[in-house]
Amino acid sequence: MSEYNFTKIEKKWQDYWDKHKTYKVNEDPNIPKEKRIYILDMFPYPSANGLHVGHPEGYTATDILTRYKLLNGFNVLHPIGFDSFGLPAENYAIQTGEHPKKITEKNIKKFKEQIKALGFAYDWDREIRTHDENYYKWTQWIFLKLYKKGLAYTKEMPVWYCPDLGTVLSNEEVIQTPDGPRSERGFHKVKRKPLRQWILKITEYAERLIKDLEEIDWPESVKEMQKNWIGKSTGAEIEFSVKASKEKIKVFTTRPDTIFGVTYLVLAPEHSIVDKITKDEFKPMIVEYRERETLKSDLERTSLEKDKTGVFTGAYAINPITGEEIPIWIGSYILGTYGTGAVMSVPAHDARDFEFAKKYNLPIKQVVSQTGNNEILTQPFTENGISINTPEEFNNLKTDEIKERVIKWLTENKKGQKKVNYKLRDWIFSRQRYWGEPIPIILDDDLNEIPLEEDELPLRLPEIENYKPSGTGESPLSRIQDWVNIKRNGKTYKRETNTMPQWAGSCWYYIRYLDPNNDNEFASKEKINYWMPVDLYIGGAEHSVLHLLYARFWHKVLYDLGYVNTKEPFKKLINQGMITSFAYQDENGILIPNDEVEKKDNKFFSKKNNKELKQIVAKMSKSLKNIINPDDIIKEYGADSMRIYEMFMGPLTDSKPWNTQGLIGIFRFLNKIWTIKNKELTKESASKEIISELHKTIKKVTEDIENLNFNTAISSLMIFINELLKHDKNYLEIFKPLTIILSPFAPHLGEELWEYMGETPSIFKSAKWPEYDPNLIIDNTREIVLQINGKIKDKIILNKGTNEEALKSIALKNHKIMQNIQNKQIIKIITVKDKLINIVTR
C-alpha cells in the first residue's frame, strides 16, 4: 500500500506542466465569445520578503475557477506578472547598496519559485514585468497619448523634502509628530518645498468615473469608496469682491441659501491672492502662520479632531447680495488644491465654521431654522429648513426653493452660477526618484515641453551606479549630464528627469497580457476584441480607490482614443478577505512578538515575566513574528493541502485567522482520498445510494464553484469522501468523476489519480466536467428540529425514517440539549417522525 508522497507528486506534475506548457493560451477563433473568459489576479509587487500565506488566497481562488472553466471547455486567459518598479526597491537599494534592478530581479526569481510551488495554472509565456523596457516602452507611449490629448501638464506643487536625506518623500514616508513632521527613515526634520510636477487631469473624467460604476459588477462598498473619493457635490460658485481692490475671490458652496449668514471668508494659506490682499501690519503674522501650518499634511490640516486655527489678513470682502463687509482670514483647514481654495463661512449652519467663529469671536448669524422662527443656537443648525433674517424676496422659503432663487439671482447679476464640484484632485504623477519609468519629454531653455516621437521609445532608464538622492530634491537622473543634455537640430535640450509613479505600470498591465510580445503596438485590436473586458478581477480591498480608479481613468482615455473596445476594464471585482494570524497582548494592550510567548495548559504566557497574555487576531507582521511562510507549509503538508485549507477557512471575502490545526485536518482529508485510491479499483457497479451521493456532490460543488463558495464545495467533498471510506472497494464509476471535481482544488493529486486510472494527462486537457443527473439525486436525509418545552434549541440532519428510540438517543446526546436539561426532570419526550423531537421538562 503506497503512501501519499505529496512532495514527489507535486514536483512531478509541476515539471510536467512546465515541459508541456499545459496552460499556454491561444486566441482560437473557433471558440465562441461565450466560451472565453479572462480571469485576473492583481499582480504582486516583488518585495524582498517573498510571499506569505495571505498572498495565495486570491491566486488560489482564481486558479480553482480557471481549472473549473478549462474542464468545462472554456478558453481561459489567466496570466501573471510583476509590478516591479517603485519606491520600496529604491529605498532598499539605498539602505543596502545593491542596485534596485538587481534586487528586483532577485525578488522576482523568489516569487516565481513560490508561485510555481503552489501549482497555479498560469501561462508563463505571458509574464510581464513593469520595469522591463519592452513593457515600459508602452507605458511611455500611453503617457504621450495623455499628453497630446491635453491630459498631462506641469505645475509647481508643494512636496515633502528632507534636507538631511537630500530627497523628496512621499506622504507615506513622513510621520507627523508633536515636534512636527519627520522622515520615517532616520527620523529627520522635513519641510514643504515647491517643485515642478507632472499632473494628470483625472478630474476631466470625474463624472464618467461615477456614472459608469452602474455598468460593472463590483462590491457596493468599493463603488461607495470610489464615489466618496471623487466626492461629487452640486451647489454654486459665488464671486466675492475684495474691498478697495480689483481682486475677486471665488468660493464653492453646496448651501448657496446660507449666503445671507456669511460672517467671514477663509482662504487656504497657499491661496495665490493672500499676498495681494494682506494689509502690511498683518503680513508678519501671515508669514509665520504659513511657515508653521504648511508643514502639516493635508490629512492633519483637515482632520475633524484637530483644533481649527487661522489668522486675519486685514482685508474685507463684499457679500454680493447683501453688500455687507466681511473679514477675510486664512486657515490651514482649507486646502488650496480643493475647490477654489476659499470658503464662505456660515457659523450658524456649519460645525467647522461654528467652532472657528467661537474661537475667534466672530459673528454668528442664523438664516435657516426648523420652524421659521429665530432660535437660540447652542450648536449649528445644519439641516434643511425655512429661511429667516434674509431680504424679503428670499425670506420664509424652504431650503430647496431659496437655493434655486439665490442661484438665479447670482446668475442674472453675474455674481455666480450653478456648479458641480468634485473632491477629486488631479493626479500628481511625477516622482523625484530613479527607479521608475522615465517621462518621454524634453525641455528647452524656457522649460517648453517637447514630446518624444513614438519611434524614439523606449526612453531607457540608464543603469547608473549612483542612484542615491541628488540632495537638491531633484531626481538622481538629473546628475547624469550626458543623458540629460541632448542635441537636436543644433539646439541643446534637457530631458525630463522626473520619473513616473509605481501606479503607472499597473494602470494598463491587464491589456499587455493580451499581447505581451508585440513590438509594434501595445496590444493588437484583434486580441483586445477577443478577450476584453476582464471577466473577473480578484484582489485586496486596499486597492479600492487608487489603483482601481487610476486604471479606470487610463482605460477611458484609451477608449476615447479608439484603442480599446470597452468603457470599463474590469467587469466583475471580488475582494478576498485578509488572512490574519494570532497575536498576543499583555494587560496594557501591548502586543508581544510570538517568539516571546509560550503556551501552558491552553493558556499563553510571556517568556520574560511569565504573565498571562490574551490571544487576539491581528494582521501578519514581521515585528510580531507571526508571518507564516508558505515554503514551510508546502514542505510539511504540500501545496494541495495549503490551497484547500486557504479556501476552506471561510467565505472568500471574509477575513479569517490562520490556524495550523485546520491545515492538519485538510492534510488528513487528502490522505483519506489516497486511502480510497489504495483500495481495489473495480469496474463493478456501485450502489444506487453511493451514486446518488456522487450526483448530489457534483451538483453542490458545481454550484459552489460558480458562486465562488469554495469553502462549502470542499465541505461537500469531505462528506462524500467519508461516505466512500465505508466501502471496501474503489468504484471506477465513482472515483473518476470524483477526481475531476477534486482537481481544481488539488490539481497535483488530481493529475496523479487521473494517470493512475489509466487516463491521458493532463486532466485539464483530456477530462470533461461531469454533469449531475437530477433523477439520480435521492435525498434520504431530513432536518430534525430539537425542542425543549416547545422552544427550538437546535436542528440536525438524520437519515429519513430514523426510528423513535434512535432519535431520542441522538437528541439526548446533543450538546445544546444536554446544556439545557441539566438539573431538570424530563416529563416526557414527544417525537414527530422525520420532523421534530420535543423534550418536556420541569
UniProtKB/Swiss-Prot annotation:
**A Gene Ontology MF term for this entry?**
leucine-tRNA ligase activity
The UniProt entry's GO biological process terms, in alphabetical order, are: leucyl-tRNA aminoacylation
What's the Enzyme Commission number for this chain?
Answer: 6.1.1.4
Q: Which Pfam families match?
A: Anticodon_1 (PF08264), tRNA-synt_1 (PF00133), tRNA-synt_1_2 (PF13603), tRNA-synt_1g (PF09334)
- List the catalytic activities from the record: tRNA(Leu) + L-leucine + ATP = L-leucyl-tRNA(Leu) + AMP + diphosphate
Q: Which PROSITE patterns match?
A: AA_TRNA_LIGASE_I
Q: Where in the cell is it found?
A: Cytoplasm
Major localization class: cytoplasm
Q: Name one GO cellular component term.
A: cytosol
Motif stretch ('KMSKS' region)? 619-623
Q: Which domain of life is it from?
A: Bacteria
Which keywords does UniProt give here? Aminoacyl-tRNA synthetase, ATP-binding, Cytoplasm, Ligase, Nucleotide-binding, Protein biosynthesis
For the ligand (ATP), the binding residues are 622
Q: Where is this motif: 'HIGH' region?
A: 44-55
Q: What class of enzyme is it?
A: ligase
Family of this protein: Belongs to the class-I aminoacyl-tRNA synthetase family.
Q: Which NCBIfam families match?
A: leuS_bact
Q: Return the protein name.
A: Leucine--tRNA ligase
What gene name is given for the protein in this entry?
A: leuS
